[in-house]
Design a protein with these regions (language model features):
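Catalytic-site signature of metal-activated, phosphate-bearing donor transferases
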Residues: 95-176
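Cell-envelope/extracellular polymer assembly enzymes that use nucleotide-activated donors
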Residues: 1-3, 33
Length: 176
């Protein structure tokens, strides 16, 4: 099982796409719980959390501090951090479940293969995917899944990250 945390900074139209993509994983029992995290009170995030049945957490600080605070309240042994507007696709549910079960107690993490938004530049996604393959370091735009204890103590950002073959689609608005 995995918990999902989605940092929300402002009104994020792509957040609804991200949540919709997670519904099958919730129904299948892969996703145990989901929380939206914001650094300040956010009416949009509160409304979405209320309508979708997910939790909301307001905690100050940078992204790493928000992930750590989220890890402290979530219940699953693994956490998937997604940016609003990023949509896991393909066979991601099976692939991430297999990765978690194969990882055992090893401190490993995984991230998706980033697919650019239609009409957007393709160089940045290619560079991010290349960097992940060569250095084992993921960008937040690739969705990071790591053990909850590694998210809680901040070490998830230092783990070697395996790249999943499942894509994560960029559905964010063109201005981002």
């Amino acid at each position: 099982m995995i918990s999902v945390v989605i940092p929300v900074a402002q009104e994020e139209p792509g957040l609804l796409d991200t949540l919709a993509a997670l519904v099958p994983a919730v129904a299948d029992g892969l996703v145990r719980d989901l929380v939206l995290v914001s650094s300040a009170p956010n009416r949009f995030a509160e409304d979405v959390a209320d309508a979708s049945g997910c939790g909301i957490l307001v905690t100050p600080g940078a992204r790493a501090a928000q992930l750590a605070a989220s890890a402290a309240v979530l219940r699953a042994p693994w956490i998937l951090a997604l940016e609003p507007g990023l949509v896991p696709a393909g066979g991601w549910m099976d692939e991430i479940a297999d990765f978690m079960s194969d990882s055992g107690q090893a401190q490993r993490a995984c991230a998706f293969t980033l697919v650019p938004r239609a009409g957007a530049g393709r160089m940045r996604p290619r560079l991010l995917n290349w960097r992940l393959g060569v250095t084992g370091r993921a960008d937040p735009l690739q969705g990071l899944a790591a053990p909850a204890d590694a998210m809680a103590d901040g070490s998830a950002l230092r783990l070697r990250v395996a790249r999943l073959t499942s894509p994560i689609l960029d559905r964010r608005s063109a201005g981002r």
